[in-house]
Every structure is written in C-alpha cells, then in structure tokens.
C-alpha cells in the first residue's frame, strides 16, 4: 500500500486492531507491527516519519484479523455513528441513539400522530422521534467525519450533498 496516498506529510495517524487468531494472540502487538510498517515505509520513501496521535488522529486505520484473514480499513466515520452529536454533555443512556431510531422506524411512526415514550429516561426516544418527524438526518449535528481529513475530500461536493433538502428520508 502506498501510504502517501492516504497520510499527508504533517498529518497524524493511529492504528487499532481486533484479533481472533491462533497466530496473533495480542491485538496490541498487531497494532504496533502495522504502525511500524507504515512508519518504516514513509522513512524509506520520504525520509520523514509520520506522527502518531492515539487520541485524535487525522487518519485512523482499523485492522481486523480472523484466523488467517486480515482486513485493513480506513475509518471514514471517526467517532462512533451512534453518537449523534446533539447532546451537550455525555449521559449514560440505557438505550443508544441508533437503537432508539430503529425502534421508532419499526413502529412505522413518522410524526403524524402522538408518540408515547414509555421509558422517558434520558430522552433518547423522544429526541430521535423529533428528528424523524422533522426529517432531520442523523449526522447533521456531528462536528466532523473522519473522511473530511482525507486528501481527496471534496468540500464543495460535501457541502452540496449535506445541504441538499430536496430528498426526504424514506422509511419502509
């Protein structure tokens, strides 16, 4: 893999791994080996070493090893998609946002009648219902997606798609 196509000079990266294998028993070992291979390739090709940022990398890579198969992925989302971005403070909700939205969609409710939230703890069902009723996309409150830091990211195209209100979400 030509990592220069994905990690620009001056950008940071991180690797995390999930391992289910007899050969590789330690996911941390796999993480370090992949990171070292990328750093070594950069040094050989450019003479520079890319920086690592575990907490807030520009580029995040995931490696998944299942027995004798490995999959290396470039993270396009960043923070987990179930974190919608509408909460000011982190609360421990017994029901995550994606599950709440799924439950509402399975009922067929679209905002054209009353909705009763029998759990009404942290308000996750009520908030997701309001978003569905107003046809507000789930990711609209996110500060950023990981793909926005990619070299080939097209801000103009993203803004065009992001701000396009011509398509309503269809729930079946």
Identify the residue ranges that each predicted region occupies:
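Short glycine/proline-rich turn/loop motifs
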Residues: 18, 82-84, 169-170
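A generic beta-sheet turn/junction motif
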Residues: 56, 65-67, 122
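Non-catalytic nucleic-acid substrate-recognition regions in nucleic-acid-modifying enzymes
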Residues: 1-57
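C-terminal edge-of-domain segments
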Residues: 61-74
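A generic local secondary-structure boundary/capping motif
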Residues: 3-5, 51, 60-62, 106, ...
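Residue-level signature of catalytic and energy-coupling elements of molecular machines
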Residues: 15, 63, 103
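Conserved S-adenosyl-L-methionine
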Residues: 95-172
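SAM-dependent Rossmann-like transferase core, predominantly class I methyltransferases
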Residues: 72-106
């Amino acid at each position: 893999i030509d990592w220069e196509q994905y990690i620009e000079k001056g950008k940071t990266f991180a690797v995390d791994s999930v391992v289910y294998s007899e050969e590789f028993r330690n996911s941390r070992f796999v993480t370090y080996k992949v990171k070292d291979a990328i750093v070594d390739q950069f040094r050989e090709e450019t003479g520079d070493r890319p920086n690592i940022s575990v907490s807030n990398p520009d580029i995040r890579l995931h490696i998944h090893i299942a027995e004798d198969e490995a999959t290396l992925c470039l993270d396009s989302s960043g923070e987990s998609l179930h974190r919608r971005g509408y909460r000011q403070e982190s609360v421990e909700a017994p029901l995550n946002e994606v599950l709440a939205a799924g439950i509402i969609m399975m009922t067929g409710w679209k905002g054209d009648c009353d909705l009763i939230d029998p759990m009404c703890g942290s308000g996750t069902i009520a908030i997701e219902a309001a978003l569905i009723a107003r046809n507000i996309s789930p990711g609209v409150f996110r500060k950023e997606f990981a793909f926005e830091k990619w070299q080939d990211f097209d801000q103009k195209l993203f803004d065009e798609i992001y701000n396009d209100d011509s398509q309503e979400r269809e729930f079946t």
